[in-house]
Regions:
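Glycine- and charge-enriched loop/helix tracts that form the active or gating conduit
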Residues: 1-123
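Alpha-helix initiation and N-capping motif
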Residues: 13, 29-33, 50-54, 66-67, ...
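Charged substrate- and nucleic-acid-binding regions of tRNA-handling and nucleotidyl-transfer enzymes
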Residues: 18-24, 164-244
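Intrinsically disordered or highly flexible coil/loop and linker segments, enriched in small
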Residues: 26, 66-67, 78-82, 148, ...
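Short, mixed-charge aromatic SLiMs
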Residues: 36-50, 95-97, 122-135, 141-144, ...
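Hydrophobic residues in alpha-helical segments
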Residues: 40, 61, 158-161, 207
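Short, structured secondary-structure boundary patches
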Residues: 50-51, 150-154, 225, 233-236
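Divalent metal-dependent catalytic cores for phosphoryl transfer on phosphate-bearing substrates
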Residues: 84-183
Length: 244
């Protein structure tokens, strides 16, 4: 329950929702929810300073029950998330796997209907630029994650994901894919290490034509992945031969 003074500061909408994420038994009184809804409908939430929005929402996403916060904000009309049961299951899994705040949020936006909706969701909650980039990158990589079954396709994934310059972010996205797909990703994590471990300088020195260096370095990285995927490729070929 709250007093009439509650409506004087719209950040309290977010704070109440955050409490529901932090405290499992926290319940929002119907009168309070009605007041929160009225404040959103009257446009009072539009005046919130961006930093204050994310300060509250981020703490809720990092809590043990972020879905409770999402539900509370959705009930009062504050634009938050795609209404998707699969998203709820994945976000719960991300919490149980103790994935970080950024991973949880990016996984939620992966269920938006399109890139524009995902961008709007991030904008509504005033997310930092780095997190918006993570959301966009992960969404773009989803088809490549699904196709990464051999050295060539895994290499394409790591290349597009900028594993060389952003190895920590790549590892995080691989873990996010594990939660989303429920597949074992240890091979992809190892592939990322091998990809980044190639001595590009040594490969470049061995080339007499400078224009061939980029292709040679990429080929060396693909070659480094071959042994990792060789066993599964061989098993797949045997299965194909036996079906003829």
């Amino acid at each position: 329950h709250v007093s009439e003074a509650f409506s004087e500061d719209p950040v309290r909408i977010l704070r109440v929702a955050r409490f529901s994420a932090k405290l499992c038994d926290f319940r929002i009184a119907e009168e309070t929810m009605a007041l929160m809804t009225l404040m959103v409908e009257n446009g009072e939430a539009d005046a919130l300073v961006p930093e204050r929005i994310w300060a509250e929402v981020s703490r809720g996403f990092a809590s043990r029950h972020p879905l409770n916060m999402i539900d509370a904000l959705s009930r009062c009309g504050f634009p938050v998330d795609p209404d998707n049961s699969a998203m709820r299951e994945v976000l719960s899994k991300a919490v149980s796997e103790d994935l970080c705040l950024d991973a949880r949020f990016a996984l939620m936006t992966a269920f938006c209907r399109n890139a524009e909706e995902a961008q709007q969701t991030a904008a509504n909650l005033r997310t930092p630029v780095a997190l918006q980039q993570l959301c966009s990158c992960f969404r773009t990589l989803l088809p490549l994650f699904a196709e990464a079954v051999d050295a060539q396709t895994a290499g394409a994934l790591l290349e597009r994901g900028d594993a060389l310059r952003r190895p920590e972010r790549m590892a995080l996205m691989i873990r996010m894919w594990e939660v989303l797909s429920q597949k074992n990703v240890e091979k992809l994590l190892k592939a990322s290490e091998l990809w980044c471990g190639v001595n590009a300088g040594a490969v470049a020195k061995a080339q007499t034509n400078p224009r061939l260096i980029p292709a040679a370095v990429r080929a060396a990285r693909i070659e480094a992945l071959q042994p990792l995927f060789a066993a599964s490729e061989k098993a797949g070929n045997h299965g194909h031969d036996g079906s003829q």
